[in-house]
């Protein structure tokens, strides 16, 4: 008995560790693991099935095959435990030791370990400072290498060919040593003196000037440092002893018919042993050199194949031409150890079945088939049967259960009571894909699911299956009930809105009962209360949709102290809404329900209920809503028939008009007035506009009907057309779908995304002809192919996101930072896309917020969590911007703090310590991935129409405000914009921004700053098709380098007869004219150059190719006049990457193809001399220093000579690269850019994601910094280090009054960031396993197991949520002090143990 207890204690000890270290194994270490040498390649005897002695399965080395029984059978049973049989050499013990006992092979010749040789960068190569090519020549016996030059002029590590070697031998006899093969490499590595090599390199670094040399030296220093710190020796990268894996991990199983199924490793080991033995024999026989060398080479190859098959040369294949699976293949990839067995395991106590609807269930319940429940809860049932005395033994209980006696079911009922089960639907894209329910036993074989949780699971009932899991332990049940119960997950963690929202039938029923119709039976009646209404309705005195007056009792709940006050009032409503008011919980205002219950309104209702009344009432209310919805959907009996698809009468006329327009454009094209591209764009435009018009006409036809009201007048009212009801309520279908049924099908896309210019004019009711049908299948198939690709891509994005953010956990309440992001409302083209209140809701304020124009009394103080009430206050005070805390600026050393994160979106209060916000962020961004599109949009058609805006018409009455605008006053009295980034906003009476517009260069602005404007007034206009060049001074024009027929071509407009000049493309000019640069200069009356105001630059404008000048030489120009214009169709063909690929590009921080070029500093623009293919752009700083930039000719420079730019402003058009934004503008603008761009993609698809989630990922992308100046730190210049490491090291240096290191932030893509994490276990299980493990082993890296993934892999509770407390408790119990704990958790110690100890000593004195 005591032994058993000891056994348990032993197991406990192995679980209690705080870090895992990986390092190179020395030959002695390998021998110490081993239980004996494997000398023979034999496996098991095919007749007796017993392992051969000294073979790969030898019982003497690896342990017995049967528990407590030696191989020859002399010793059997427990009593001989620990005896070693003298006959067969087997130790009598448990057979499972065959899973852990290793053997070894003594290699007759050293062998280079392929990982350290071939895994780039080659570690052996770096160590020896030789190229991989050279080392391989030595290893594979093609060249000699000098290992010890002695007194000869030869150099150490010099390669010699066979001839050179022989010559050298004759010349110097035995004064030098040279060798080939792994022995030579081993010798070279063994004789390296790391310490002196290190000193030499540091000196060399100080003296070298070449960039490439520096890189190589830094790499070598880092490698040698790693060897010194980890205690590894370089020669261990060449193996002299090979460990042999325990046999049960590479099993050999006899199949019937005398064949064997075996692990590939056995084949690989056999090869190694065979060659090793042969080599040993050859060496004993003193065989000729050439044979021995060949054998050594073969040994090297076979060991390579065993470790990593296919890394070098062709992979060794087995009998069936399939490459053998080597040790490296076992751990990497989706089928490898990490991802197949450690991160995802099969789970017992689980079952799966088809799901069906359970409309009568409560929200916390699910229907579990009796058969399933019995199987899942079997042990519990057995135990209870025994306890009740219904069965004496387990076996008897089993019999009872198998017979399914009546009492078994009663006991099952008891066992299941209040024992929650987990339901999971694959794919589990976010945490709501697994929820807990209380099971209700049902007949049948399908699991019943509550309809309201379908949205969260993304489930429907067309054959979906779900898995059931039983939480066994008490803690597990508790967590399931408290955290995972469906009733505790009403809000979505992605955006904080209710996810338990009725859909489809329920919405239809609620919408139907809450519609108001004219002149229905009982209109105008007055009722004393809702029960009276119910009575009247049940007795058919009133109809459901009749407008009536009802006295309704309202209960108001005070938000602060929860006091309830009630009052009654008579309300105009309908019978249906009055009935609906009966199910409203007390305290929810009736006006919320006194509308048409569309899906949006129902969602708003549930949201208000949750915020006002809390969880419990809301859950009960949601259930009642569902029951009511189903009941009335049944009564409504809504069905659709072909006659519901009403085709508008106007359709014919609209189509005729469009056809005429298209014909006209076709004629223009044939007479050469428009280009093919313009014609296509215009045609597509016309059709998309027509399609819209028909859709509108159709919605009017379907959506309204004429009725008589009570007074006998005919009026329009919303129709009760079944199709319209469904779309309007949000139950099913949308305007776009109805348009295809009853309007026109519209334009179709080709598989490459371009639009077919002939639209489908018919709709589905009229039917398509053959050509139309063919055109429509074309795009539809693409859709199906897209969906399949999309799922895979989206899943991969989610995996990368989870991996990069998995270790972000809330670790403290407040990090104390004062930094944050400044939030303003998002305004685009006159619409407030996202008001300030939505952006700051649930955030913590970083700085006190004052009323605009009042700095005395703050409205909100720092560190306030903004909830709905606070946000409303800000809105009333019309605050424009708030600085809020953000995870990006959080200063916690590990994880983030609760204040910087703000509100836990799924719970509605400040986030708890231990919440795994990183994983939540990754899931929230990844989950909607499948809804995003896959294609890249070509700008054309609808998109370009939106782009051709040519004026600003304000939508609200208020005042005009210019931001960032430079303008000149035109003679006509209006202003002309001469800056690119200018914006015009409209403020309302409170000074709140309502609209914001971009003002393009050259726009004529008819309003002044601060002017009052009325809604509908036009305040600016411009020519959308031409980019003007505006004169900033008044004077006369002088043409320079205008050579007719060479640099300019004169054209005369056929219609107007006016002459204009077009600048030619320099590529098309002759060699002599390449240098000519057409310039328009502005001079005064005497011909002297004028300068641009506030600068000393001449007023001259360099004209790009294809620009058109309408003025004549010597013509007078005024301020703000157009000197030349550049036609703008060229830049319109840029593709926009949309949807999923765009999100992936942003998170991977990829540089766009032709990135925008940003100004490296602030200053004045001028152009230098052009080179062959590039233009030279110069920015002159205020202090006179210059910055030059060479820009390819084909790029569009959007700044002009003499213009002032600020650092980070765009000077060349294009998509900005995130790295540039970070470098020139800093972290906050980068964060803002990433959030905006990613949100734009999701917003287009109507997906709401909170900014926080994107910020959490951005924080992880900014984990690393690059050292610019090492100071006195241990880092090297150009090294990338975790930001936290540098901050800690700097703090230490400052304490000692030494120079701290300087650094710049680095932006890594999510894949790179995941691989660069501190934890090698997490990185290895993600991608590039070999590279990560090689690197970690050389460094002797220790993994402190701080992230979630590492802990899952080693099989412990994760340090998040309830696991956080467990880990804290475990550390307390192990009796470690705080400082020791810090060391373990990876604070500064560990990397420099000696220094740390010296420090500690110094401090104590």
Swiss-Prot record:
How would you classify this enzyme at the top EC level? transferase
Tell me the residue numbers annotated for binding Zn(2+) 1.
70, 72, 85, 88
Asked if the keyword Nucleotidyltransferase belongs to this entry, the reply reads yes
Q: Which cysteines are joined by disulfide bonds?
A: none
Q: What does the entry give for GO biological process?
A: DNA-templated transcription
**Among the entry's GO cellular component annotations, what is one?**
DNA-directed RNA polymerase complex
Q: Does the keyword section mention Metal-binding?
A: yes
- Please name the InterPro entries in this protein's record: DNA-dir_RpoC_beta_prime (IPR045867), DNA-dir_RpoC_beta_prime_bact (IPR012754), RNA_pol_asu (IPR000722), RNA_pol_N (IPR006592), RNA_pol_Rpb1_1 (IPR007080), RNA_pol_Rpb1_3 (IPR007066), RNA_pol_Rpb1_3_sf (IPR042102), RNA_pol_Rpb1_4 (IPR007083)
Renumbered to this chain, the signal peptide range is none
Gene3D superfamilies (alphabetical): 1.10.132.30, 1.10.150.390, 1.10.1790.20, 1.10.40.90, 2.40.40.20, 2.40.50.100, RNA polymerase II, clamp domain (4.10.860.120), RNA polymerase Rpb1, domain 3 (1.10.274.100)
Q: What EC number(s) has UniProt assigned to this enzyme?
A: 2.7.7.6
Cofactor(s) needed by this chain: Mg(2+); Zn(2+)
Q: Where does Zn(2+) 2 bind?
A: 815, 890, 897, 900
**Cofactor binding note from Swiss-Prot or TrEMBL:** Binds 1 Mg(2+) ion per subunit. Binds 2 Zn(2+) ions per subunit.
- So what does this one do? DNA-dependent RNA polymerase catalyzes the transcription of DNA into RNA using the four ribonucleoside triphosphates as substrates.
HAMAP family in alphabetical order: RNApol_bact_RpoC
Q: What is this protein called?
A: DNA-directed RNA polymerase subunit beta'
Species this chain originates from: Xanthomonas oryzae pv. oryzae (strain PXO99A)
